[in-house]
Amino acid sequence: MQLNNLKPAAGSKHAKRRVGRGIGSGLGKTAGRGHKGQKSRSGGFHKVGFEGGQMPLHRRLPKRGFTSLTKEFTAEVRLGDLAGLPVAEIDLLTLKQAGLVGELVKSAKVILSGSIDKKVTLKGLGATAGAKAAIEAAGGSLA
């Protein structure tokens, strides 16, 4: 078997639909477009979302929500992920080096998800009330 001899399994590929190639093909003359009208013409079709003059759905529905500008600069870190780190003092740089937060992140918050049984100290990081309680119960602290 060589790369130049590879081909799809028999019957796995359908032949391309060749329209407008004679009446015997079943798709000759009008090529499956019917007679006259806008949709039979070349380039004759409405734009996406056009509903024939009726107010389109995307304009009938109200605007909703917004795009947060701070989303890419903030991050959440699970408490269970901190347990896997080899250091006892954890700050934003440590999280970036471990790949737990992205390079653009400027602030991170620890959330209560998973468990921690080792003593850790958080420096310059936020924590939810539950995460703070779990860290302090394990003998850790927030600086």
Curated annotation (Swiss-Prot):
Signal peptide: none annotated. It holds the Pfam family Ribosomal_L27A. GO terms for biological process: translation. GO terms for cellular component: cytosolic large ribosomal subunit. Keywords: Ribonucleoprotein, Ribosomal protein, RNA-binding, rRNA-binding. One of its GO terms (molecular function) is rRNA binding. SUPFAM superfamilies: Ribosomal proteins L15p and L18e (SSF52080). Residues 21-31 have a biased composition (Gly residues). Residues 1-57 are annotated as: Disordered. Binds to the 23S rRNA. NCBIfam families: rplO_bact. Part of the 50S ribosomal subunit. Belongs to the universal ribosomal protein uL15 family. This is Large ribosomal subunit protein uL15. It comes from Ralstonia nicotianae (strain ATCC BAA-1114 / GMI1000) (Ralstonia solanacearum).
